[in-house]
Amino acid sequence: MDVYEMLNIKSEAEYLVRQAQGKAMTGDHNAAVNYLKKAIDKEPRYTEAYTLLGNCQDCLDKKEDAIASYDKALRIDPDYADAWFNKGMILKKMGRSKEATECIEKSIDLYCGR
């Protein structure tokens, strides 16, 4: 039995995302970004990886990169509420209130099933 089976992980990309989550939780966002980029290389349509990448980029004060990561997640899944919400929060931090409100409202609609 290999490590992926032992951890009940479906793919190497999922394993890499879990590693990234652990690094992000300890504040090592640069390492998390590296894991996430590897996960995306393995599975280019992994919306959760793009969203977590955006979160880490935000923590590293790379706001434009974070927005681009959320946009990639949303191109894959336009109904991914977490990406809409996180994008809205960054836009709000950047003073882009109108765009932020639109994104956050979209996320609320999706969370509520509207």
Regions found by a protein language model. Name each.
Residues 10-42:
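Alpha-helical segment of the N-proximal tetratricopeptide repeat
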Residues 40-41, 71-75, 108-109:
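Conserved structural position within tetratricopeptide repeats
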